Amino acid sequence: MKNVDDLIDSAAELAEHGLSKGEIADELNVSRETASWLVERAGGNHTDTETAATTSTADIHVDWSALGRDSTRLRYAASAMADLLAKQGEEVDLTVGIEKAGAPLATAVANQLDTDLGTYAPAKHQWDEGDIDEQGGGFSRNFAAIRNRDCYVVDDIITSGTTMRESIDAIREQGGEPIACVVLVDKRGYDEIDGVPVYSLVDVVRVDREE
């Protein structure tokens, strides 16, 4: 995808397949607000582009499909992510992937670090509009349980930090202790979230120039 029109078309296609706006945000690696805007644009419910640019918060789309579609490349990326975590805690025996895209990354990271694997489905996957606090996430029972264990948390992109913060809270509610988080790309440049160190292969900083 090279431009906004491509993203709008992709958002429309995903919406037609029944994905919620939160799931569309996850698929396109943008914020929930951006996903909602793209879907509205696809439906013809939009303002002039210039007006939209001045009234909405800009976002950055990240396409890492060149890694995701090739198992060897994905393994190499996960190896680098695992290396960032390697010195964080010798007692860590569980890696939690945030669904959807964080799960395959976490699988490869867990393999590198020889830990068990868990997955967490965030609340945004159920979100279409309104207050996301009315939705709830959950851990898959098909994978390892938290059970008061120290954990690493893995995702692909940090856009606002909301999903990572939710995942950290959910782990703590289960009695677990998040030791560190790692992502491919961090759009916000976090050093930590709620006291948990955050590591990324790439930090993205948006620079706005005022003429």
From Swiss-Prot:
Sorted UniProt keywords: DNA-binding, Transcription, Transcription regulation
InterPro entries linked to this entry: GcfR_halob, GfcR-like, PRibTrfase_dom, PRTase-like
Chain segments annotated as coiled-coil in the UniProt record: none
GO biological process: pyrimidine nucleobase biosynthetic process; regulation of gene expression; UMP biosynthetic process
Gene3D superfamilies referenced in this protein's UniProt entry, alphabetically: 3.40.50.2020
One MF annotation (Gene Ontology) recorded for this entry: DNA binding
Pfam family, one: Pribosyltran
Disulfide bonds: none
Protein family per UniProt: Belongs to the purine/pyrimidine phosphoribosyltransferase family. GfcR subfamily.
Biological role stated in the UniProt entry: DNA-binding transcriptional regulator that functions as a regulator of central sugar catabolic pathways.
Comment text on domains: Contains an N-terminal DNA-binding winged helix-turn-helix domain and a C-terminal regulatory domain (or effector binding domain) resembling phosphoribosyltransferase (PRT) domain.
Protein name: Transcriptional regulator GfcR
